[in-house]
Every structure is written in C-alpha cells, then in structure tokens.
C-alpha cells in the first residue's frame, strides 16, 4: 500500500491567536489544510504578548528578534511545497531564496497595510511582496485595485466568519432592546459618527447601547451605555445580546480598504446591521434585505428608528443576513476558494 506523503506548508503570520487578522485570515484554516493532506508549520512574526510588565519590557523585544530569525531559518532551510504569508513583509533576500528553491508563496493581506504615515516605506514593502508573490489574496475590491497597479491579478476572498460558532441566540423575553457595536480601542473613535443620532433616539425610545472592545475611557452621555472588553471566548455571547449591529466608518483611503468583518459577524448571529456606505460595506449590506446604509445623522436616525419600531423587520433582515453569511462568507466557503488557488500553484 502506497503511503501518501503530506505536503509541507509554511504559514507565516502577523501574530498569534491574539491577533485578529492572523486568527481570521490564516490560523483558523490550519485544521482544514491538515484534513486536505498538508502538514502545516506555523511561525508568527511575534510571540504572544505577555501580560507581565517586566516580561513585556525586557523579554518581549528579545523574543521578537528570535521570531524574526525563526522565519529566516524556516525559509532558508525548511522543506516546503508552499509558503503562505499573511500580512507580514519578508526581505528581498528571502523572496529570492524562495524563488531559487522553486517554492511558491501566497501573499494574503486584508487592510491598507501600505498606508502608514509612521512607516512610509511600507508602501514599497507591500508592492515588493505583491510583485513577486506567485499569488496574492486580498479581502476587498479596493485592495484588488492596488495590486493591479503592480501587475498582479489577485483573488478576492473576504475574511471568513465562523458561522458554526457565531449563531443566532435566544433573546430573553424581557430583555431591553440592545443596539450594539463591536470593535477595538482604536476603532472606537468612529463611534463619534453615531453619538448624536443615538442620543436623539434615547430621548424618544428605551434601549441600551452595548459596546464591546472600545477604549476603557469611552463614554457617551444621555444613553444607557454598557461597555464590555473584547474577549474571544465571550464573542458569541456578546453579539447574541444585540438586536441591531452598527458599523460606522469615516470615508478615508484607509477605511475604504476595511474588510467588513464586523458586519459578517452580525449577519452570522442573525441580527440586522446599519453601516456607513464606505468600502466593502456597500457590497455586504443590501439595504432592506439584510440591513441598511446610513451616511449622515438623519439617515442613521431614520434607519435605527425603523428597526427599533419593527420587530418583524429585525427578524426578517437578520434571517436573510444569516443565510448570506453561510452561503457566501462562511469559513468553509472561503477555504474552498483558497484551497483551489493553492492547488493550482
């Protein structure tokens, strides 16, 4: 009986499971790759960030250097059939090494990593990765256009949502209607865009505003506001408490490249969403079918008022969104697209 040799895959990521992009765009695919006969070796750019202050100040910088060296060793001496690089940059020397060894590499990124005022050379680093990758995968049409300018025709795969983990939940009968937002300390600055409509609604309707992952010092006056830290294990429970999910975004070069993952999570949980008409939001949100788009204060007010007053509409839009999340954006659907790309290399 012939024993089938496993295909060696080196997976280089921007971080560990505590890094959202690495977890969503790469790490959650590892079991799927292994089921398809790949032996996956994961090397992150940085180690898990320690909570201890001394370790963070003294040992973490040393470990970061060691992990960079591990990437160098893996590329130069490892035996691989494919290298999957998520978001990070590798040197021209290492790119040439892969080419000389006839090892194809896939480059995946999901944000405008080339726009960083503090690191202006990121644009050239990103362009270099795009030019020499055997295949580039991006999350939005806007990132696709960036790659085309460097002669690369990428594939678009949205950030996959775990529809088996993030599911509709049974709401408590007497639970107060909850308008929710989930994000990060950095993106909580975008909440300024919806504060006035929410405050105006609070003068007329009874609801609570749940923020998950916002800055610890974020406050909004005149509203029943509940703030929770983002914890992966609590993600489904927190989203499940929401009746309406929000994604406000300013219209900038950087936000137009965002992947809309928050919307996909709301949809997976079966709740309607209201979002700014920026970037991929305009593709994901189908007004009147799975949510609404709102560009100005009055539109935010009107869309939210409509959803507050119409329970059946919330159920309908949420159900439609759940169906689309499973059919178009689930981890299984996205992995099938990714696998076909890799198998052709």
Specify the residue positions occupied by each region the protein language model found.
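A short, well-ordered alpha-helix in the C-terminal region of glycosyltransferases
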Residues: 306, 313-328, 334-340
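Nucleotide-sugar-dependent
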Residues: 189, 226, 233, 237-268, ...
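Donor nucleotide-sugar binding/catalytic pocket of nucleotide-sugar-dependent glycosyltransferases
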Residues: 113-114, 131-167
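Conserved catalytic-core segment of nucleotide-activated headgroup transferases in glycan assembly
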Residues: 17-32, 36, 163-165, 172-241
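Conserved acidic donor-binding segment of nucleotide-sugar-dependent glycosyltransferases
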Residues: 287-298, 306-312
């Amino acid at each position: 009986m012939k024993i089938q040799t496993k295909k060696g895959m080196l997976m280089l990521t921007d971080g560990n499971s505590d890094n959202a992009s690495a977890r969503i765009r790469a790490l959650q695919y590892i079991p799927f790759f292994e089921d398809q006969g790949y032996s996956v070796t994961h090397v992150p750019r940085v180690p898990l960030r320690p909570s201890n202050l001394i370790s963070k100040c003294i040992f973490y910088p040393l470990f970061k250097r060691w992990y960079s060296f591990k990437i160098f060793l893996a590329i130069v001496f490892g035996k691989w059939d494919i290298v999957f690089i998520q978001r990070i940059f590798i040197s021209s020397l290492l790119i040439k090494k892969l080419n000389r060894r006839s090892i194809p590499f896939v480059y995946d990124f999901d944000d405008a990593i080339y726009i960083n005022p503090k690191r202006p050379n990121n644009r050239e680093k990103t362009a270099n990765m795009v030019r020499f990758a055997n295949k580039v995968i991006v999350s939005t049409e806007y990132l696709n256009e960036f790659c085309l300018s460097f002669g690369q025709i990428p594939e678009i795969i949205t950030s996959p949502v775990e529809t088996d983990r993030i599911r509709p939940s049974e709401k408590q009968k007497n639970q107060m209607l909850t308008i929710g937002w989930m994000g990060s300390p950095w993106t909580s600055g975008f909440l300024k865009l919806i504060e006035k409509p929410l405050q105006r609604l609070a003068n007329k309707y009874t609801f609570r505003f749940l923020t998950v992952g916002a800055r610890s010092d974020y406050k909004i006056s005149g509203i029943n506001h509940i703030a929770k830290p983002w914890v992966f294990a609590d993600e489904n429970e927190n989203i499940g408490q929401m009746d309406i999910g929000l994604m406000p975004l300013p219209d900038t070069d950087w936000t137009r490249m965002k992947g809309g993952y928050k919307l996909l999570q709301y949809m997976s949980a079966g709740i309607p969403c209201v979002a700014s008409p920026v970037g991929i939001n305009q593709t994901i949100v189908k007004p009147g079918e799975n949510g609404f788009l709102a560009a100005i204060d009055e539109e935010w007010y009107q869309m939210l008022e409509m959803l507050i007053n119409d329970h059946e509409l919330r159920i309908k839009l949420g159900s439609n969104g759940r169906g689309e999340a499973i059919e178009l954006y689930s981890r299984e659907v996205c992995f099938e697209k990714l696998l076909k790309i890799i198998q052709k290399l």
